[in-house]
Amino acid sequence: MAFTLEDIVQRFGGEVVGNGSQRVGSLAPLDQAGPDQLAFLANPKYLSQVETTRAGAVLINAEDLARLASRESRNFIVTPNPYAYFARVAQTFIDLAAPKAVPGVHPSATIDPSAQIAASAVIGPHVTVEAGAVIGENVRLDANVVIGRGTRIGADSHLYPNVAVYYGCKLGERVIVHAGAVIGSDGFGFAPDFVGEGDARTGSWVKIPQVGGVSIAADVEIGANTTIDRGAMADTIIEECVKIDNLVQIGHNCKVGAYTVIAGCAGIAGSTTIGRHCMIGGAVGIAGHVTLADYVIVTAKSGVSKSLLKPGMYTSAFPAVNHADWNKSAALLRNIDKLRDRIKALENAAAGRQDGPAANAASSSAGDKA
């Protein structure tokens, strides 16, 4: 299905510059788009591509439009945030093109008689819904999803294949959980019960029952193979509109504030609180029992071992450098204690010279005057 630029502006706002009757039916990058496609400019360093693109129209902000050398024979939709505008238009195109799922329960699904399934829900092959679970309106559970006893899934949510949501968890409306994610598995809680030292040490680790749940608010998206552990006593909490990438681990009793984004392979240890509107980069490690303020940014591969109580950007990762340069830096790092001692010795020697003959002469002169 194709839309005119005027149709798009009526739905999403913005201003058409050029031919409002131009029709577009899909989206593409600036350097690949054709005459029936819509492209966007989110980064001004690609401005030159706007002047050579074959796109039927380009989403652009007013500042970048003013910088163009020529607008001749080109069509634009002017909007303050072309990237977000692109995302909304793309979602509309995808929704219209996607086949409509038919409500109902697949014959191979296993549904406990006490579970409540909305008539508009789509329950796929080999899904399991345990006792007391509640599945809301327009929920879609794809193949092999498992919903534990007493768990509630809010309206318009979509759980992709092989998602497991353990017992007693709550997912709000419009939650998306991608394939293989696990919500509500046991938190990593073990009490040490050892006596003795060395080879004479005896005892074991005692598992601490994890009797809390996981509470996920509306409009959260969770990536493939991510795990969110249930709380030890209270719930692990994910607030509204949090976006979590693939392969993220969130430990028990964590709280992730609204509108925070967490990139892939990050690991967040238990009882950590992350504020609102934070950005956690890929492969970041956050220790347990720490707090991050609102609007904190932690760059990729950083390690956070203590609370970050002021907004801002934090980095502890070492950026990649030429291998030979890294070896030189590593050699210096190994000898840093020796270098420190040499500097301290030089400082002491310099201080001794200052306290030496000149200082003694001044003292003697003062004594003579007395």
From Swiss-Prot:
Residues 350-370 are annotated as: Disordered. GO terms for cellular component: membrane. It catalyses: a UDP-3-O-[(3R)-3-hydroxyacyl]-alpha-D-glucosamine + a (3R)-hydroxyacyl-[ACP] = a UDP-2-N,3-O-bis[(3R)-3-hydroxyacyl]-alpha-D-glucosamine + holo-[ACP] + H(+). GO terms for biological process: lipid A biosynthetic process. It is an enzyme of class 2 (transferase). Its EC number is 2.3.1.191. The keyword Transcription does not apply. It holds the Pfam family LpxD. The keyword Repeat applies. The active site is at residue 252. Residues 358-370 have a biased composition (Low complexity). Signal peptide: none annotated. GO terms for molecular function: N-acyltransferase activity. Keywords: Acyltransferase, Lipid A biosynthesis, Lipid biosynthesis, Lipid metabolism, Repeat, Transferase. Pathway: Bacterial outer membrane biogenesis; LPS lipid A biosynthesis. Homotrimer. Belongs to the transferase hexapeptide repeat family. LpxD subfamily. NCBIfam families: lipid_A_lpxD, PRK00892.1. HAMAP family: LpxD. Catalyzes the N-acylation of UDP-3-O-acylglucosamine using 3-hydroxyacyl-ACP as the acyl donor. Is involved in the biosynthesis of lipid A, a phosphorylated glycolipid that anchors the lipopolysaccharide to the outer membrane of the cell. This is UDP-3-O-acylglucosamine N-acyltransferase. It comes from Paraburkholderia xenovorans (strain LB400). The gene is lpxD.
